[in-house]
Amino acid sequence: MAGPTLLKESGPREVFCGLTSIVWLHRRMPDAFFLVVGSRTCAHLIQSAAGVMIFAEPRFGTAILSERDLAGLADAHEELDRVARELLQRRPEIRTLFLVGSCPSEVIKLDLARAAERLNDELQGRVRVVNYSGSGIETTFTQGEDGALAALVPLLPSSAERQLLLVGTLADAVEDRLIHLFGRLGIDRVRSLPPRQSTALPPVGPGTTVLLTQPFLTDTARLLRNRGATVLTAPFPLGAEGSRRWMEAAAQAFEVAPSHVATVLDPLMERARIALEPHREVLAGKRIFLLPESQLELPLARFLQRECGMELVEVGTPYLNREQMAEELALLPEGTPVMEGQHVELQLDRVRDSAPDLVVCGMGLANPLEAEGIATKWSIELVFSPIHGIDQAGDLAELFSRPLRRRQLIHPGLHPTQPDQPVHA
């Protein structure tokens, strides 16, 4: 079957680590605390990414591994237990404590699973302690959420009741809107993972139909299947088309009449089309290069090409689960280069050679590329922004049209990298 050209490369990477996901997870579950076991670098990353004031009481922190810990001269397990006890004594509102591994803790083989088990025995149910890895040694930053949710799956109560389970963190307002729309479709029992309170874990079992809201939850999906749930394969809810197909997959699973689906969703699609028009005028015909970082690249590429008229130079993704992404791959134009993995130097060479109008990349690459005259969009901004659902299609398109509008105001009529070449019409 014709489709995109799937390629693979390996080499040096330029990505954030999984600790970054704590920034949105701690906001999602205000009764949870994320204790990173890592270095001062880990602490600086989380503090900077979250933008928390120094006098605030954040719901995350770092148990810093000292040189004595790293050299094996001190018992890091005893010190970790002491820090956890002091934290829980000072913050009695904590109901779930996540022990989050990092590159340093993995290098010295610190067993956080054992630490969580010891603390659970000691606390006797007063606080639930779970662990997962946020290390960036072999993963990218969004996989931190996959690790956190995968750690919760064994704790979910069992139930055979018929329900729809939305898996993946969404902005509260976006989630409320989607649940409202599912209710209008006749799907009334809708739950979420992660929940808004860490103790209100949704049940799972043979009657559970799972709809992933994010494309980077591979391990969580596998564990939910092992619990008896059915995980639907559908395009992800980015853009109007993807969001509609995503909701239609749930409607089909719950045997909702297609005519009723059309009655509910057609007016929303028309509103989205109108909202997209001013951004499509800017984006249509422009060439975009997506570097791998967030694993949102394939759904974004599909949206930008099919709904905004952009030309895909190359679509990079850190990892490609072909089964989970089958619906997205099927919607990409034939011959589109989809590159799994990264050799950052080679990819930057291809960026310079292809001279795209816009590059989606990590913060570490954005400023150097901007200095070379190449317009960029931070991929991490797409993770923090409320972009899911039909209603958000216009806002999603604006995130890409804004840097091009800004560049045209600064250099009207000029190509981003070749001043003697006109901007694509």
Curated annotation (Swiss-Prot):
Name its pathway.
Porphyrin-containing compound metabolism; chlorophyll biosynthesis (light-independent)
Q: Cofactor stoichiometry and binding? A: Binds 1 [4Fe-4S] cluster per heterodimer. The cluster is bound at the heterodimer interface by residues from both subunits.
Gene Ontology MF: a single term: oxidoreductase activity, acting on the CH-CH group of donors, iron-sulfur protein as acceptor
Needed cofactors: [4Fe-4S] cluster
Keywords, in A-Z order = 4Fe-4S, ATP-binding, Chlorophyll biosynthesis, Iron, Iron-sulfur, Metal-binding, Nucleotide-binding, Oxidoreductase, Photosynthesis
An example GO BP is: photosynthesis, dark reaction
SUPFAM superfamilies in UniProt: Helical backbone' metal receptor
Q: Which reaction does it catalyse?
A: chlorophyllide a + oxidized 2[4Fe-4S]-[ferredoxin] + 2 ADP + 2 phosphate = protochlorophyllide a + reduced 2[4Fe-4S]-[ferredoxin] + 2 ATP + 2 H2O
Give its E.C. classification number. Answer: 1.3.7.7
Q: Supply the InterPro entries for this chain.
A: LIPOR_BchN/ChlN, Nase/OxRdtase_comp1, Protochl_reductN
Which amino acid positions bind [4Fe-4S] cluster, per UniProt?
A: 17, 42, 103
Oxidoreductase found in the keyword field: yes
Family per record: Belongs to the BchN/ChlN family.
The record's listing under NCBIfam families reads: DPOR_bchN, PRK02842.1
Q: How does it assemble?
A: Protochlorophyllide reductase is composed of three subunits; ChlL, ChlN and ChlB. Forms a heterotetramer of two ChlB and two ChlN subunits.
What is this protein's function? Component of the dark-operative protochlorophyllide reductase (DPOR) that uses Mg-ATP and reduced ferredoxin to reduce ring D of protochlorophyllide (Pchlide) to form chlorophyllide a (Chlide). This reaction is light-independent. The NB-protein (ChlN-ChlB) is the catalytic component of the complex.
* PANTHER family tied to this protein: LIGHT-INDEPENDENT PROTOCHLOROPHYLLIDE REDUCTASE SUBUNIT N
Name it.
Answer: Light-independent protochlorophyllide reductase subunit N
Q: What is the primary gene name for this protein?
A: chlN
